[in-house]
A protein has these predicted regions:
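Helix-start (N-cap) detector for alpha-helical repeat units in TPR-like alpha-solenoids
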Residues: 79-80, 113-114, 147-148, 181-184, ...
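Residue-level recognition of tetratricopeptide repeat
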Residues: 87, 121, 155, 192-194, ...
Length: 307
């Protein structure tokens, strides 16, 4: 399946303007997707070279980074201002800088769970999964009721192919969910972790809470709801797959395409259609959203196929 425009008889019900930071109300990544990531974009520093050989760049400082840096300089022992700067840097794809900023905060606040969560989150984007796992484990020890810490710990474990542990973390995160949005998000990753662990019956049971009356509040979670209905057999792959993004500035379209393509690709792996899955994963990694979970997951699957 190519990334060229195709007609699939399916449209998004709504669009949402994404905020600047990842954690404000949901697990949205769209706020952190740059409009360009190659040399043609007027990029900042090189962040990483992916395992597939692609150079992934930061974006230059914007007003948010400049202001946050000034605020921290005025009060360098403020955890709140450390987090403000780290999030502003991450929004400009400055992940290495964000990790360094969080580390600076941990030097004077070594028992702050939010700082461990923030650093672990950014390490995931840098593909530093083991350091991320250690930081996120520490966050859960310091704040046992922090849903975001378990959620991101589950991602670290999942990307390390520790699927049983990932399922346990997502199950714990889901138990802490206080909204349908969190229930939907955690259920998706719990399901895929259990399927990758070979626990098909448990995975099916994990979807039992996703009944027709479970509706998303944040409109960007609509594609997760559709994925869950696909897993339940209520929608076909053709119906659930969104069109490719309209262009490099179509951030919401990119996130939706990557997330659903990765989910459907995973489904095809479960059903022994690896060649079809690989086609979807290759489409994802052609895109711009190199920090989205669907992009990272697709990248890892392609790398595993080369082993």
């Amino acid at each position: 399946m190519s990334r060229t425009k195709r007609s699939i008889g399916w449209k998004w019900e709504s669009r949402v303007r994404f905020g600047m930071f990842f954690f404000m109300a949901t697990f949205s990544l769209a706020a952190q997707l740059p409009s360009q990531i190659g040399a043609e974009a007027g990029h900042g520093a090189l962040e990483i070279t992916s395992g597939l050989g692609r150079k992934l760049y930061a974006l230059p400082d914007d007003e948010g980074v400049i202001d946050a840096r000034k605020n921290l300089a005025a009060d360098p022992k403020s955890v709140e201002r450390v987090l403000q700067l780290s999030k502003a840097e991450a929004a400009r794809r400055q992940y290495k800088e964000a990790v360094a900023t969080s580390t600076q905060g941990l030097a004077f606040a070594p028992k702050n769970a939010d700082l461990y969560l923030e650093r672990g989150h950014r390490e995931l984007g840098l593909r530093e999964f083991k350091p991320a796992m250690h930081d996120l484990e520490q966050a859960t020890r310091l704040a046992p009721e922090m849903l975001d810490a378990y959620y991101h710990l589950g991602l670290a474990q999942y990307f390390l192919a520790e699927f049983d542990d990932a399922a346990a973390s997502f199950d714990r995160a889901r138990a802490l969910a206080k909204s349908n949005d969190s229930l939907i998000d955690c259920s998706n990753w719990l399901y895929v972790s259990l399927r990758r662990a070979g626990k098909e019956q448990e995975a099916a049971q994990a979807l039992a809470r996703i009944t027709p009356d479970v509706k998303n509040t944040e409109s960007h979670l609509y594609f997760y709801v559709r994925l869950l209905h696909f897993y339940q057999g209520q929608l076909t792959a053709e119906a659930v797959l969104p069109p490719p993004p309209a262009g490099p500035e179509d951030l919401e379209g990119e996130l939706a395409f990557d997330t659903v393509s990765y989910g459907v690709g995973n489904w095809r792996l479960y059903h022994h259609s690896r060649s079809d899955a690989v086609g979807l994963f290759r489409n994802v990694v052609k895109g711009e959203a190199w920090n989205s979970w669907g992009f990272i997951g697709s990248e890892l699957e392609l790398l595993r196929g080369e082993e």
